[in-house]
Amino acid sequence: MENTNIVKATFDTETLEGQIKIFNAQTGGGQSFKNLPDGTIIEANAIAQYKQVSDTYGDAKEETVTTIFAADGSLYSAISKTVAEAASDLIDLVTRHKLETFKVKVVQGTSSKGNVFFSLQLSL
């Protein structure tokens, strides 16, 4: 697994604290969204996304990893296109409004082909 060092986050990734957050996300990953019940609400204080190249079954591909940093120090991560798209917009919104804490709802759905997918909502 190779990290391509492209990071988008709600925090400054150039500071020591920001770099530690990214390091912890990349090396620890946290709990997978797959293990969360539908509708789980995470009291978050940061979100980050980074690209990594994964080699699954000899098929190398670049993927976006999304990590939500909970206020209690927990990390929640997903490799999911729908989560990545929602999180990218959420990062922009949180950054634009300078939110220090926010509630993220993890939503689970099923596609017309029966595949389970995840997305994010901002909870009030």
From Swiss-Prot:
GO terms for biological process: DNA replication; viral DNA genome replication. It comes from the Viruses. Keywords: DNA replication, DNA-binding, Early protein, Viral DNA replication. Coiled coil: none annotated. InterPro entries: Phi29_Phage_SSB. It holds the Pfam family Phi29_Phage_SSB. One of its GO terms (molecular function) is DNA binding. Monomer. Belongs to the phi29likevirus single-strand-binding protein family. Single-stranded DNA binding protein required for the elongation during viral DNA replication by strand displacement. Displaced viral DNA strands are transiently coated with the ssDNA-binding protein and therefore protected against nucleases. The latter is then probably removed by the replisome that performs lagging strand synthesis or during the events that lead up to the recombination process. Stimulates in vitro DNA replication several fold. Has helix-destabilizing activity since it removes secondary structure from the ssDNA in replicative intermediates. This is Single-stranded DNA-binding protein. The gene is 5.
